[in-house]
Amino acid sequence: MVLNEVFREYLEEAIGKDNSLVAFSAFERPASSSVRINPFKSGPVPEGREVLWNRHGRILAQRPVFTLDPSFHGGAYYVQDSSSMFVGHVFRQLVKPVIADSGNAGPVRVLDLCAAPGGKTTDLAVSLREMLGYRFVLVSNEVMKQRA
């Protein structure tokens, strides 16, 4: 892969020569495929190794043809890059102490203003339901019409 020289120099300066070489070599490898399993649906899901920061995430050994899989269309899993699943991990770590302190103060309210296409929103919904049952309100909105 041919990378822009300005980008190469910037990355070397930002993270150091050794780390930038690791990043540049990653650009040469095929992209990984990962899915997030919907724990509230049933059906066969692709097997893979667990994403460290999301117990419902799986990194696949190879990319299947998702559009031919009825479980995909039935919502048993969502195709999502493992790096996007990290947002849910951060959310869970930040919200746990808030929930512990709130007791029965009423439903937890969450507003997602960058909601399209919906992968991170559904990850938040699963996390909230696992932590709170149905004691939450999640409002998702996408302000950019072309993304919605």
Pin down the residues of each PLM region.
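S-adenosylmethionine
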Residues: 1-148
